[in-house]
């Protein structure tokens, strides 16, 4: 008589896989998440939360770009930075990379303590998705332009006090960040310089209000959106800006139309060097 093989279920066996609960969400393509190459630009408050969420969501290949050192005012909004990091003058990108490795030692984390504009022109080309976690409009426009040119999805986040926004840019299907800017924006365009004490800084922008709960909400929306993109759930993406007002308890989804005169869309006609677009 042939013996039948029975699958033995051990009590608690599903608790041995730390990603078991996430894998139970049917639309999440966990294998794609683990293969994806992710770039986080900005390692401050949003970068801390986004980085932590990425690692806990199963992303294994993460690169971080930030030119600044950690300062004391970061500590109320950056869960992964400590007082000793300030005292020793550590770099944001370096410390964030170090702390993400502590959360999951199997994660491959690289870091660059430079302005994104100082990296090679085709630096973004190697990534599958970019997360913008910046307070610098010039850097934001830089990653917007380069990500759009190479056909790489960009999930950009920003906060102001208890309000925040997430903009989703899927080339060439959606508007880009620059599409939503008007003449006033460009007239008032001013770079927010590093707080690291660089000698070449002569103009400073005022410090903006910020607090951790808003940062946490925006970062969560960014990473959830990124999971949808990597899992190819394009129909579930917002079209294409989420606005959050924590004081008024309001979420709004706004559609930003493509500006045909936007230089990124004019340049789109030339597809040389671009990556394959999402289907």
Question: Which ranges hold each PLM region?
Answer:
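N-terminal charged helix/coil linker that caps or initiates catalytic domains
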Residues: 1-39, 72, 267, 274-279
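Hydrophobic Val/Ile/Leu positions in short beta-strands of Rossmann-like dinucleotide-binding domains
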Residues: 40-43, 64
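Hydrophobic/small residue at the entry helix of a nucleotide-binding pocket
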Residues: 46
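Generic hydrophobic/aromatic pocket-lining and core-packing "Φ" positions
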Residues: 51-52, 144
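Conserved S-adenosyl-L-methionine
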Residues: 56-61
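Glycine-rich phosphate-binding loop and adjoining beta1-alpha1-beta2 segment
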Residues: 64-104
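E1/E1-like adenylate-forming module used to activate ubiquitin-like modifiers
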Residues: 109-111, 121-218, 228-234, 245-278
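Conserved acidic residues
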Residues: 113-115
